[in-house]
Swiss-Prot record:
MCR is composed of three subunits: alpha, beta, and gamma. The function of protein D is not known. It comes from the Archaea. Pfam families: MCR_D. This is Methyl-coenzyme M reductase II operon protein D. It comes from Methanocaldococcus jannaschii (strain ATCC 43067 / DSM 2661 / JAL-1 / JCM 10045 / NBRC 100440) (Methanococcus jannaschii). InterPro entries: Me_CoM_Rdtase_D. NCBIfam families: met_CoM_red_D.
Length: 167
């Protein structure tokens, strides 16, 4: 289940861990869980997925009107402020392969404390580890970018609007 990425003249061995809570997370819970995850040693990157929380109604008769959703908040993760734009339904953590067992113990404890409603944890490859065509189109010379950005590209969005680098 380990993936090797030859990038910038080094080999990075990484494994993805997916946390799938049985309910969507509130902004406060998301903030708490992300801070606890980033306290673990060996975390490469963390991705949150979920239903979008738009600022304005995207279509229909109310198109353009503001959406005042209670979970579209600014949260603080490791001292960095970020706007939560999704109702978090899953968290994908990319970890260093050699630290997987220790990290899994920590993740299990974090989940037990914060998800009394239940959760599932999966280990595998859930993210891109090799540069995609879109990466080449967006960045050009791939050898000069941070390896954590591989596969994180939305071709139609600005990087600062779609990716927040925490660590």
């Amino acid at each position: 289940m380990k993936n090797e990425v030859k990038f910038m003249s080094e080999v990075i061995k990484v494994v993805d861990v997916k946390i799938f809570p049985h309910r969507y997370l509130k902004a406060e819970t998301t903030e708490k869980v992300l801070n606890e995850i980033y306290d673990l040693d060996g975390i490469v990157r963390v991705i949150v997925h979920g239903q979008p929380l738009p600022k304005t109604v995207p279509f229909g008769p109310a198109r353009g009107l503001p959406v005042n959703h209670q979970d579209r908040k600014v949260i603080k993760v490791k001292g960095e402020e970020m706007e939560l734009r999704v109702k978090v339904g899953e968290i994908i953590i990319t970890v260093e392969g050699e630290k997987l067992e220790k990290i899994m113990d920590g993740i299990e404890e974090i989940c037990k404390r914060n998800f009394p409603f239940g959760y599932d944890i999966y280990v595998g490859a859930f993210t891109k580890i090799k540069p995609t065509v879109t990466d080449y189109m967006k960045y050009g010379d791939i050898s000069s970018i941070d390896p954590r950005l591989i596969g994180m590209v939305d071709a139609s969005a600005r990087l600062k609007d779609s990716v927040k680098m925490i660590k």
